[in-house]
């Protein structure tokens, strides 16, 4: 991955890869949950704890990278005395709880010593091929042997790194797993061969992973993310949400969207965003950790940690920063930036304005070019605007300042003092009209042009100095 971050903590659709794996593992209703880590164990543990998993995971350190069999071996005491052990790779987020339940169902129904989860890939290069008869696993053929046998090479079904074992069979076989000749590691799938030699029953459960497997590189992470997005968006569409172009929509796993909402192209819904029913989002809109209530519209805009009320209108090209609240029927229009502010019911900030640290009442109109001047170079200060106030275009509201209910400000005013309710505040130089200005201006310009032209003609007639002849 070429990263300082552990591979299992790289995010897929808003959550680390490991989050999906542990979520799937919980479908088995485990009595114990062990996470084997190497190197950045503290970093992984710190990331996992806030997820509030039950049972709480036990973190086991694999001091040397000696392979998957060794990783399972070092977790023996953390696993405890149980009947079955489920083993999953921490970098395979496409495996779901449904897949885990299918694996365990086959494992218990066939009374197998070990059962593997399998999937079909268009390109199975690098994976062990599965040879089976029904649910019975006949053989698991490694990459080198598969390349040597055309019949095996044609098999597309491969082993995932998800296994179910009878505990006692697993931990009796692990000490017998030798080192791989090429890598020097101990591989878990060698346990299957040992169990097969002991005439134990082996089973296989096939699932559909959508053509993806684990995350081993940036390119595989992009492929897995695409498959995950397709799953997420498919679930939303099944719930009554319209995606005009699903291929250009980016929706994180924790996002919730109500029915009859339309998501237009090139929109990104991230984090814990909640969108109500009957909304229109996009195109080219990014919303993170925000709440959009019913029938709101957000167009060509960026929202972070904001709340938008019913039937409110945002954009185009609005930027709503953390702490912004737009109440029912409110508007933040074209090229408007709002931060840590509350805009009341039916109030409008239509265009080209900055509103920061402000409380705006109901049915207020904020004219174009208005700025709440909230920063004095050291601290931020609040602006309060009462209900039904009218803020003239290009008004500078120098905070801290209050504009009363039904008060007005004149266009172009710099308001530095509180404005009483119902009053008009105007702060600008008095307009002076100069009669006949255009005629005098043009006459003066014409005279200047004539004088310049005469000067040019005079210079052309003047004799040029030169060498005497003769």
Identify the residue ranges that each predicted region occupies.
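Conserved beta-strand segments of alpha/beta enzyme cores
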Residues: 8, 56-58, 136, 201-203, ...
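Conserved alpha/beta core of the MobA/IspD/sugar-nucleotide pyrophosphorylase nucleotidyltransferase superfamily
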Residues: 156-258
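Residues that recognize and position ribonucleotide moieties
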Residues: 10, 93, 163, 214, ...
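Conserved core of the sugar-phosphate nucleotidyltransferase
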Residues: 42, 95-182
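Structural signal for interior beta-strand "rungs" in well-ordered beta-sheet cores
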Residues: 242-427, 431-432
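N-terminal nucleotide-binding beta1-loop-alpha1 segment
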Residues: 1-4
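Conserved N-terminal catalytic core of the sugar/cofactor nucleotidyltransferase
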Residues: 11, 15-109, 446-447, 468
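Long, low-complexity, intrinsically disordered segments
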Residues: 456-470
